[in-house]
């Protein structure tokens, strides 16, 4: 049976179908997926899926803060710190975009409700973390990730053009003639659905759950990366995996 995805007053899927059409399919609902959904045109129908519940995202677990360009005078040092930390293998254009856009992103996060530590004058307070040569890290206590992601999630849930399906797994992406046409998903009730989408975004997190010891949620098993490799999608820097020192141990 084929039918379009029906969006209700509160952004819920109102009919069960075996195939559906949406404008944008976002796999994953961490910071990346949520921020994308909030920045897409409101006339686009968006389907978001997440493998577990929406709050079981590693974005919620991030404790440290996020770096931000305080002023233009800090740009060169910020750029050099980032390149050095990446052994100068970074994509320079991506680093530039990350730095230049950081202030606007922070403004968006604050507008979404995120609260960051302030100094005695009410201005953002900055601290310093690894690889940074100066204080440029904003934070919320020791739960910055939770503070940011929870507010982004709240704002997304308010959008009538977004359907968020929890406990829904992407089984594979759908391709034809080297073009991605959507994905096959399995919903919480076990239904297998072919989702046709004009754009498919894989924002499903990393592979930490595959390791014996990890600070990641166990369900983060690299499904999106595996699907991309299967369909010959170009993968970059997949040899870089951050191992947190607190988990780098064995019984022997």
Which ranges hold each PLM region?
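Short amphipathic alpha-helical patches
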Residues: 89-90, 102-106, 131-133, 224, ...
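Rossmann-like flavin
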Residues: 85-125
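Helix-loop-beta segment of a Rossmann-like dinucleotide-binding subdomain
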Residues: 88-92, 123-149, 208-212
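Residues forming the flavin
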Residues: 1-80, 120, 141-252
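Catalytic phosphate-handling regions of large nucleic-acid enzymes and associated NTPases
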Residues: 116, 129-131, 172
């Amino acid at each position: 049976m084929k039918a379009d995805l029906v969006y209700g007053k509160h952004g819920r899927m109102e009919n069960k179908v075996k195939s559906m059409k949406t404008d944008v399919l976002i796999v994953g609902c961490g910071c990346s997926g949520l921020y994308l959904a909030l920045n897409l045109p409101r006339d686009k129908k968006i389907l978001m899926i997440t493998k577990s519940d929406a709050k079981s995202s590693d974005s919620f677990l991030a404790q440290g803060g996020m770096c931000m360009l305080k002023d233009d005078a800090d740009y060169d040092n910020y750029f050099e710190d980032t390149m050095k930390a990446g052994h100068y293998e970074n994509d320079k254009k991506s680093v530039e975009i990350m730095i230049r856009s950081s202030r606007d992103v922070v403004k968006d996060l604050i507008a979404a409700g995120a609260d960051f530590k302030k100094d005695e004058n009410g201005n953002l307070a900055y601290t310093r973390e690894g690889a940074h040569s100066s204080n440029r890290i904003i934070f919320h206590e020791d739960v910055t990730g939770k503070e940011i992601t929870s507010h982004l999630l709240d704002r997304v849930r308010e959008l009538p053009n977004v359907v968020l399906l929890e406990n829904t797994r992407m089984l594979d992406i759908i391709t034809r003639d080297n073009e991605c046409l959507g994905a096959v998903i399995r919903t919480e009730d076990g239904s297998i659905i072919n989702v046709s989408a004009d754009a498919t975004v894989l924002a499903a997190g990393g592979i930490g759950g595959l390791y014996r010891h990890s600070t990641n949620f166990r369900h983060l098993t690299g499904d999106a990366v595996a699907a991309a490799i299967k369909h010959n999608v170009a993968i970059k820097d997949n040899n870089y995996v951050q191992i947190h020192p607190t988990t780098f141990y064995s019984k022997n």
